[in-house]
Amino acid sequence: MALGIRAEPAVFDEEFADEVRDQLLTMDGVLVWVDPLHEGKSREVLDPLLRDVAARGPWVSAHPDVILKMGVKEVLYRTKHLGWGADTHLYRTPAEFHAALPPRLQSAGPRVLKQNRGNGGQGVWKVELVSAPAGKPSILRVLQALRESVPEELPLAEFMTRCEAYFAAEGCIVDQPFQPRLPVGMIRCYMGADRVVGFGHQFIKALIPPPPEGPDSPAAQPGPRIMHGADAAPFQALRAKMEAEWTPQMIEVLGIGAASLPIIWDADFLYGPRTASGEDTYVLCEINVSSVFAIPDQAPAAIARLTSDRLRRTRGD
């Protein structure tokens, strides 16, 4: 209430979607935290509802149309020419996938395949070629990013058939090189619209084979995400690139107006190869828009200020 904002919760489920729509239409603005996939459910009912609400006047963040541009793995392909990019490829059909993946695995080493929409490591695979004997099926070693996953070896054709489900509902698969510095950790850059509001560093275990003790052992669990403010010294080079270069370039490429950027979103970076002078580089591995939490302690104040500003614009104050 310090900024004059009266907030109230709105709990969504498909069974009472109409009641939620009626509630949202009485609001000036709506902040949305809903995973793209959760316990077998998707946003196929929620997203049209939010589009309808936004068309009738209330401001919605993040708008579903913005999520479809930013918060999907395809953004890794569309922005691969930016400084955060890598040798990224996109497969829109099973035919493209079957034609391009086998030679790429032979020539480019381990890859990471990602379904377009998902969370929690669902549909994200480290894939590497084990053997490709002449006249016999090629064998892969694959590891999914889901917690407690274990590596498995199987024929290439069998794995590609398994992945065909990711093309349903106009889906696609993004293909990136595996980053060898993954054990160094991941940096989550928290954004309030086009400004950095904090960072989180975490030693992740996804796509790393579990220790001998097993995938459910303490040693196999990810470390805590250590939160930092936007001014944290270790991340100032990344902050400068995000604010001055990469975010402006991204919204231009994606055709997103600056005023449509989500109030809170984050970009996950892995450490790329060091430069000749020993400086770190950063490779984007995901943008999260649909349900960003937890957040640094400094972020809520920035979210509140941005929300207040957007609401004033919506009302024409």
Regions found by a protein language model. Name each.
Residues 14, 36-37, 67, 117-119, ...:
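Short, solvent-exposed loop/turn segments at secondary-structure junctions
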Residues 31-33, 112, 174:
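Structural motif
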Residues 237, 241, 251, 255-266, ...:
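C-terminal active-site "lid" helix and adjoining low-complexity regulatory extension at the edge
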Residues 78-136:
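Hydrophobic alpha-helical segments and helix pairs
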Residues 1-103:
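Conserved N-proximal alpha/beta basic substrate-recognition cap immediately N-terminal to
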Residues 109, 121-122, 126-257, 270-273, ...:
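Phosphate-binding site of ATP-dependent enzymes
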Residues 46, 183-186, 264:
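Short, surface-exposed coil-to-beta transition loops
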Residues 5, 84, 170, 256-263:
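Short secondary-structure junctions
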